[in-house]
Amino acid sequence: MFLKRRSTKGHELTRNVVSEVWCDFVDRVSSRLRQQPHRECVSLWLTMLLLALAILFGVAPATVAQSKPDKDYLVYVLSEAADTISLIRFGPGGARVDHEVPTGDMPIDIDGPHGIAISRDQEFYYVSLAHGRPFGTVWKYSTKDDRVLGRTTLGLFPATMDLSRDGSLLYVVNFNLHGDMAPSSVSVVATEPMLEVARIQTCAMPHGSRLNPQGTRHYSVCMMDDMLVEIDTATLKVSRHFLLTKGREMGMSGPPVAKKTDGPPAKHLDMGGHGMEPPKPGDISCSPTWAQPSTSGSSIFVACNKSDEIVEVDAAKWSVTRRIPARPGVYNLAITKDGTHLLATNKRDQSVSIIELKSGRELARIPTRRKVLHGVVVSPDDRYAFVSVEGVGSEPGTVEIIDLAALKIVASVDVPEEAAGIEFLRIEPAK
């Protein structure tokens, strides 16, 4: 496991610091020890020696006892560059790929599976295939045998998506990664016949499709317009939008006004790296990549990928509540089921942040084995988080598994290249 990898330089620095602290501590207590009876003196010195050795060699007891799972946790993950769906099984024996399913129908080009959603009854799952000729598609699968049950064509580069509470409607953002910087849309798909029943125009490069817990509002963000967009699920129309740029925050009713796209595209709109580009000097844009409603639906948390912060928007007042500092390239978000902690993948920082929502304080920054972080999902019992890491070039993708009590990675498993969308299936008896 990568947590055991420590550089020699870092270890020497740690030892030097501990040595200085230890010597200072010894100097301060030596005079007191001389006044103690011999038996107490020896006992105290032994205790101090054991503590020093534990610190020096990293064997100090953990503050939280770590235990292996006694059941199997099943997670689906997509590999965008390999047209593969993998089912990950994590249990008492560790983490492994249970099986893989090929997806797509283009014999030469990559179809690019990007987003995944699973029905609440755990009978079906849906996968968006972002690439197309030119339009992408969404496919419906059975969780029993991974059989394709239906498909439908959507817009340009369909990406993240979410399901209504009853599973009848699927909300898919048409990200339009490689197209003109024009307003794109959210497709609404009836899942029984697999038919697109609405295409709702929003703004440029929508991403991060999420419904509130009540199922009454859908939220997405637009990377190129710095906006959070709310859709009323009863009318299937944009009800409000919110400008997220720091110093220019503004909540407005109705849909955004479409910008004119005459003339050549602006140079700063190159999004080939999709969240990997650091901001240029003077750039104050948010470049949002995810919208995550709270467990009560009273707040929406937005990942600002360029300004490296998480913006909390009050759903009732439609105003900014606070800006939480984040790591470079904060990308996808997830909230624990008890509503107390927010998890963030940091695409440019090669790490995952665990944030206490009440205080906004980062409890842990957890490095990952490979670069280019993508998605994160929390198990229903709030015990583990599963993180997809794309990797670079020919590297395999990775699923890293975090123990949320110990705040450390406890398992890692390789999957095909460019691990992207990730979703939790179920917990079942261990095999």
What is the predicted function of each stretch?
Residues 46-50, 54, 193:
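Residue-level detector of intrinsically disordered terminal segments
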Residues 4-7, 61, 314:
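Generic detector of short, well-ordered, non-transmembrane alpha-helical segments enriched
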Residues 7, 19, 26-27, 49, ...:
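Short, isolated positions within intrinsically disordered regulatory regions of eukaryotic proteins
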Residues 54-63:
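C-terminal segment of classical bacterial N-terminal signal peptides
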